[in-house]
């Protein structure tokens, strides 16, 4: 019952984020009362739902240390396979996630910051998802209800798998490919300087540069609404995918590689990089805890490093023909990139 509550609250909080006020405290009574008229539940305020969930998670998490685990629970539990420590970390981490959402403004600001303070100042009492082995996920069963091979649907919706120029701008120091640019490195990935996750996400393209007459190879070309229609049409017609040669146009999400159609890709519910990003923001902004630039930097670097490691882990276990095309960055290279991102002022909004 405790595990079911955690999963329910995770789902419900996400639903509240989308829709706001919802039936909650008096919802789903029909199976219990058989009263149709009484089953039309009133709407609870979003703030009240969040307040309830934050309080419940605080109460639930430590109980996983004391609960007697039923013999058959490990086979019934398709999330954590009966691991009570992971359920405790899941509950605490979900509470941190939700507390951060309300810590900046609104009626629950004080409650959110108090929860953050309580957890971050007592890590032994409130263990979090902080390492890859703590990640919360459902294993892809490849058949039945738990068959969710990553990227299902991308094959039917071409525009949904095109790279975004804005994302590429953030991942490459020389930005999204621009044929009109005087920068010869436009759209080029530079090892040791750029985000190595782009190699697993998107296919590079080759295209004849109308300005120089030369073929620009290994370029990352994302969609950009600010580009003139005529040039967009040229990109669509002339850019050649270097991985899937049947594709023309903008860089696309890599198929049968790290993510799309990788049947080894788990359904991630909560991953350690997110928790370190949340902690970094807490220390940087002083949400619940005293501002601490050194701790914020440490947590940010952990988040970036662990994210890169996670990407390359799923690439390494993929059985697709487009997986493992690139060597994973070394720990030193990953740390250097994370440090460069922390020190960058390019996107200091």
Named regions from a protein language model:
Residues 302-334:
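Conserved small-residue
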Residues 234-235, 322, 337:
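Long, compositionally biased, charged low-complexity segments
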Residues 333-349:
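Acidic, glycine-rich loop-and-strand cores that form catalytic or ligand-binding grooves
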């Amino acid at each position: 019952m405790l595990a079911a509550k955690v999963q329910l609250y995770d789902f419900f909080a996400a639903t509240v984020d989308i829709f706001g006020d919802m039936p909650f405290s008096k919802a789903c009574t029909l199976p219990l009362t058989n009263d149709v008229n009484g089953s039309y539940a009133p709407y609870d305020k979003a703030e009240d739902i969040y307040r309830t969930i934050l309080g419940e998670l605080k109460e639930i998490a430590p109980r996983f240390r004391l609960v007697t685990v039923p013999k058959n629970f490990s086979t019934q539990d398709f999330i954590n396979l009966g691991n009570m420590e992971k359920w405790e970390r899941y509950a605490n981490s979900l509470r941190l996630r939700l507390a951060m959402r309300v810590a900046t403004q609104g009626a629950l600001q004080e409650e959110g910051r108090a929860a953050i303070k309580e957890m971050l100042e007592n890590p032994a009492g409130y263990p979090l998802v902080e390492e890859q082995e703590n990640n919360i996920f459902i294993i892809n069963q490849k058949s039945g209800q738990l068959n969710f091979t990553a990227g299902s649907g991308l094959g039917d919706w071409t525009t949904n798998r095109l790279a975004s120029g804005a994302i590429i701008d953030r991942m490459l120091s020389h930005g999204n490919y621009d044929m009109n640019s005087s920068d010869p490195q436009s759209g080029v990935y530079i090892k040791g300087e750029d985000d190595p996750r782009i190699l697993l996400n998107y296919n590079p393209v080759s295209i004849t540069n109308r300005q120089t007459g030369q073929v620009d190879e290994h370029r990352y070309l994302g969609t950009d609404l600010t580009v003139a229609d005529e040039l967009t049409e040229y990109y669509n017609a002339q850019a050649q995918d270097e991985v899937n040669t049947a594709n023309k146009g903008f860089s696309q999400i890599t198929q049968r590689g790290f993510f799309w159609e990788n049947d080894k890709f788990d359904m991630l519910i909560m991953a350690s990089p997110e928790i370190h990003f949340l902690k970094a923001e807490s220390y940087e902004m002083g949400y619940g805890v005293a501002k601490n630039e050194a701790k914020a930097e440490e947590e940010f670097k952990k988040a970036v490093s662990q994210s890169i490691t996670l990407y390359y882990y799923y690439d390494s276990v993929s059985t697709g023909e487009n997986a493992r095309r690139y060597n994973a960055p070394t720990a030193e290279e990953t740390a250097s990139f994370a440090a460069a991102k922390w020190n960058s002022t390019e996107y200091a909004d």
